[in-house]
Design a protein with these regions (language model features):
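Internal helix-loop-helix
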Residues: 2-52, 56-62, 103-111, 235, ...
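Glycine-rich beta->alpha junctions and the first turn(s) of the following alpha-helix
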Residues: 137-240, 250, 274, 279, ...
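Secondary-structure edge/capping motif, primarily at the C-terminal ends of alpha-helices
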Residues: 207-215, 245-259, 299, 396-403, ...
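Charged, glycine-rich active-site and insertion segments that engage polyanionic ligands
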Residues: 270-303, 447-466
Length: 515
């Protein structure tokens, strides 16, 4: 907020800034941890006195922030932390004792958001702890695979004396704070990954244009064009999904503020409403980044393995993103869990549409030619993809019921289908919007991106769907649903090679990512 030293801009603007900083390697990690998980707990959960004391100095950079949640025995199971907070006899202070690890910015942070359990409490409580409070030991910097320019240390709180007024939010409300801040961190990570991807693609294109083999630039060869096109297609898709969700969040915040909620609470609630999407974006964005840097190394060939070339650092730095903000496996579980919880609360009708799809399986397929309009065809394909997801998710939920959460392989199959569906639809919506607002001749390659993405998504959905169905169905039921899956993921013939070549040729001519 402007009254606390910020710019007061909307969520989309914040995401654009996050994307721009995303290509800054280790610095991106440091500043994201400071402005995100380090500062936001105080902004969103602090009382007015806490916000006035800390936020202006954090916003200006005078103070740097860190976030102390992870412990040696509590990673994904964050609420199992052992750090303790004991109230002093005079009731004026808490004495915090415990060990935190993998703490970003720990080496230079002035302020820590620390999670601990008071007495025998079941859930965590958050505290604002200043480095100057003393009795804090910062271990030497960790020797990491990547992001070597960022600070990552273990932090020990040795009976650290913290004023009671530095309790953040409510007692035992720390786990809720952690979850909500992680939702923000996930979508921000996806935005930063886009920035990293675009920088790597620029390097890939420039090297491919400059590197001569057999008397020609390697960018003229089909194998390299395929790699460049795939890098761009995946990043375009991630970009479409990230900014679709970001605008949805802004719209939700605006509606909540209009209804009388204050901006901080509205922001948290707006993002909470899209917790499943945040997990989708985090998984997809981090895995796209891994793909892009891997192909970047390959385009560079032997030089890509050299620490003197830009790909080596990009390759190492990218890997942490599949672990940050909850591992991708945990996030895949969260996607399905979030949707099932919404269904049980009546916020999402999952079983109704799933039952309609089940009825459709018994009917005769529609063999009509359909519309000639490419966007209408794409919308029809997305509708079919949705039927595939509903069929499998609905059947799995109905058949396995409470056991579904224990069948993690099936949950991950369903989650991967949901991710593919959400991202594919996002690409369609983005290209369609551009088609309506710009000269259609200017976005022909973006239409190619849409068509290639849908082509590949159909195969991916079919693969994930078959894996799931073969894991929980059998007999005639299995045969019927496999036929339905084939129907719902049917793909018309399409020359993907030429489409990728057109996409790559545009990238090569521009000398940079240009979509």
């Amino acid at each position: 907020p402007e009254n606390l030293g910020g710019f007061g801009k909307d969520f989309v603007t914040g995401m654009l800034a996050t994307e721009k900083l995303g290509g800054a390697y280790s610095f991106a990690v440091s500043i994201s941890a400071h402005t995100g998980i380090g500062t936001l707990p105080i902004l969103y959960y602090g009382n007015e006195v806490q916000k006035q004391k800390y936020i202006p100095k954090l916003a200006s950079g005078e103070w740097k922030a860190s976030y102390c949640l992870t412990e040696p025995g509590s990673g994904s199971d964050a609420n199992s932390g052992k750090t303790k907070a004991v109230l002093s006899d005079d009731g004026k202070h808490y004495h915090i004792t415990g060990q935190k690890m993998w703490i970003t910015n720990a080496g230079f942070a002035d302020v820590f958001t620390v999670f601990a359990k008071i007495g025998d409490d079941e859930n965590l409580t958050a505290f604002i702890v200043e480095k100057d409070f003393g009795d804090i030991t910062i271990n030497p910097e960790e020797k990491k695979m990547g992001i070597k320019g960022s600070s990552t240390c273990q932090v020990f709180f040795n009976n650290t004396k913290v004023p009671v007024e530095n309790l953040l939010g409510e007692r035992q409300g720390g786990f809720k704070i952690a979850l909500n801040i992680l939702n923000i961190g996930r979508i921000k990570l996806a935005g930063a990954a886009i920035g990293s991807c675009k920088r790597v693609i620029d390097h890939s294109i420039n090297y491919a244009n400059e590197r001569l083999q057999f008397g020609r630039s390697i960018s003229k060869y089909g194998a390299i064009k395929h790699k460049l096109a795939e890098q761009a297609i995946k990043v375009y898709a991630s970009n479409a999904a990230v900014y679709r969700c970001s605008q949805n969040v802004d719209d939700a915040i605006a509606a909540l503020v209009a209804g009388g909620m204050n901006k901080e609470k509205a922001t948290l609630e707006g993002i909470r409403q899209f917790a499943a999407e945040a997990a989708i974006l985090k998984v997809h964005g981090s895995e796209v980044l891994d793909y892009v840097v891997d192909e970047g190394v390959q385009i560079y060939g032997g030089m890509g393995y050299s620490a003197e070339a830009p790909m080596e650092r990009a390759y190492r730095d990218a890997r942490i993103n599949r672990i940050f903000e909850g591992t991708n496996e945990i996030n895949r579980m969260l996607i399905v869990d979030s949707l099932l919880k919404k269904a049980m609360k009546g916020e999402l009708d999952l079983m109704g549409p799933a039952q309609e799809v089940a009825k459709e399986l018994m009917s005769i397929p529609d063999f009509s030619a359909g519309s000639d309009d490419p966007f209408e065809q794409a919308h029809t394909q997305i509708k079919q993809f949705k039927k595939a997801v509903l069929m499998i998710a609905g059947s799995a939920a109905q058949k396995l019921m409470m056991q579904l959460s224990k069948e993690q392989e099936i949950v991950m199959n369903i989650s991967d289908m949901i991710i593919e569906l959400y991202v594919a639809e996002s690409v369609l919506l983005r290209v369609e919007k551009l088609m309506k607002s710009e000269n259609s001749s200017k976005i022909s390659e973006q239409t190619d991106i849409l068509n290639v993405y849908l082509y590949d998504a159909a195969d991916q959905l079919n693969k994930y769907g078959k894996d799931a169905l073969n894991s929980f169905a059998d007999g005639d039921e299995l045969k019927m649903m496999l036929m339905g899956l084939k129907r719902f993921t049917k793909q018309k013939p399409f020359n993907v090679k030429e489409a990728r070549r057109r996409i790559a040729s545009h990238l090569i001519a521009e000398g940079k990512y240009c979509y």
